[in-house]
Amino acid sequence: MKRPVTGKDLMIVNMGPHHPSMHGVLRLIVTLDGEDVVDCEPILGYLHRGMEKIAENRAIIQYLPYVTRWDYLATMFTEAITVNGPEQLGNIQVPKRASYIRVIMLELSRIASHLLWLGPFMADIGAQTPFFYIFREREFVYDLFEAATGMRMMHNFFRIGGIAADLPYGWIDKCLDFCDYFLTEVVEYQKLITRNPIFLERVEGVGIVGGEEAINWGLSGPMLRASGIPWDLRKVDRYESYDEFEWEIQWQKQGDSLARYLVRLSEMTESIKIIQQALEGLPGGPYENLESRGFDRKRNPEWNDFEYRFISKKPSPTFELSKQELYVRVEAPKGELGIFLIGDQSGFPWRWKIRPPGFINLQILPELVKRMKLADIMTILGSIDIIMGEVDR
C-alpha cells in the first residue's frame, strides 16, 4: 500500500486478523490522520481452502458436505445451489413436496443468518443486550434443523432431485409455533433497537451507498436493496416454489447502515410469512410418513403421485454432468450466491466457479470508510455482513 504524500504525520494501524469485530480472519491495514480514515486495504485469503479445486475432483454427492463450510451460518443455501446446477443440467424434476420443504428450510436458514448478523452487529457498536436475545431465538431454529436433518449446523440435507429425508412427526406443528412466537420477538427487537437514539446516532448516515453505485460495484442482497433497488432473485428467477407464495421485497432508499439493518429486520418477517404459507399448503398435508402410505395402494392410491414424494428418482453416484455451461444462482441472506458450472460428460465438473456475495460486497469497504471516523469502520463492516469462509473459500 502506498503512503499518501502529505505534510501530516499519518498512522498505519493493523486491524485483525484476530480482532473480534472482523467476523473471521480478515485483516485491514488502515491509514489514519488522527481519528479520520485516509485509506483502508483489506487483506484476504487467511481462510482459503481451495473449495473450487476440490469440486473438480469430487462427484456432486461427495462434494455436498464440503459446501456447508462456505457460509457456515447459512448452509442450506450453499447446498441448494450445489444441487440446483446438476438438476438443471440433467433436467431433473423436483417433487412439489420436496420443493416446499426446501423453501421452508431456506427461509429458516435466512432467519438464523440474519439473527446471527444482528447480535454481533449490535455488539460491534456497543449494545450487548440484543446479542443474548438473538441466541435465544436462534436456538429454536437450530432445534428445528436438528429434528429434521440430525444436525444443528452443516446439515447435508439437500439431494439432487429432492431432500435427504421427509419431515419427522410433529415437526410442522413445532415450526408453526415458532413462527407465531418469533413475530412477537421481532416487535421486541424494534422497540429495543430501532428507536434507540444511541443506535440511530451510530448508524444513520454512515456508509451511504447510492443505487447506481451499488449496481456498478456488483452489490447484491440487502446491500443492494437498502440502496433503493428492489431486486430479489426469489422474485426475478422464481426458483423452487417462491412464485406460489404471497410476499413482498423489502427495500429502503437511504443506502446507509440503518437502511441495511431495516431491510434485514423486515426480511425476517417476510420469511415467516413464506414459511407459514408453505407449511399450510404442503402437498400431502401434515402427515409426514408419506413414504409408507405410498405402499397402501388400495385405500390411498394418490399417495404414489410424484408430487407427494420428498425425493425423486435418485441419480446414481456416477451421475454424469452433460457437456455444457451453466450459471445458477439463489438469493442467499448476504446476496446473490451463484455457481458457474461446466460439465464435461463426466461425474466430476470440469469447472466449478463460486460467486460468493460476501466477497463482492466486501470490495466496496475501502470506499465507504474513507473520510469516516475509525469507530465507524466497525459499523460499516458489520452492516455489510460477511463470513470469511465464504469470502476466501
Swiss-Prot record:
Say which enzyme class the record assigns. Answer: translocase
Pfam families in the cross-refs? Complex1_49kDa
Which Gene3D superfamilies does this entry report, sorted A to Z? Cytochrome-c3 Hydrogenase, chain B
Name the Enzyme Commission number(s) assigned to this protein: 7.1.1.-
List where in the cell it is found.
Plastid, Chloroplast thylakoid membrane
An example GO CC term for this entry is: chloroplast thylakoid membrane
Q: Which GO terms describe its biological process?
A: photosynthesis, light reaction
Keyword terms of this UniProt record = Chloroplast, Membrane, NAD, NADP, Plastid, Plastoquinone, Quinone, Thylakoid, Translocase, Transport
Q: What is the membrane topology noted in the UniProt record heading this document?
A: Peripheral membrane protein
Q: How does it assemble?
A: NDH is composed of at least 16 different subunits, 5 of which are encoded in the nucleus.
Similarity field: Belongs to the complex I 49 kDa subunit family.
Per the entry, what this protein does is: NDH shuttles electrons from NAD(P)H:plastoquinone, via FMN and iron-sulfur (Fe-S) centers, to quinones in the photosynthetic chain and possibly in a chloroplast respiratory chain. The immediate electron acceptor for the enzyme in this species is believed to be plastoquinone. Couples the redox reaction to proton translocation, and thus conserves the redox energy in a proton gradient.
Query: What's the name of the protein?
Result: NAD(P)H-quinone oxidoreductase subunit H, chloroplastic
Say which species the protein is native to: Barbarea verna (Land cress)
Its lineage reads: Eukaryota, Viridiplantae, Streptophyta, Embryophyta, Tracheophyta
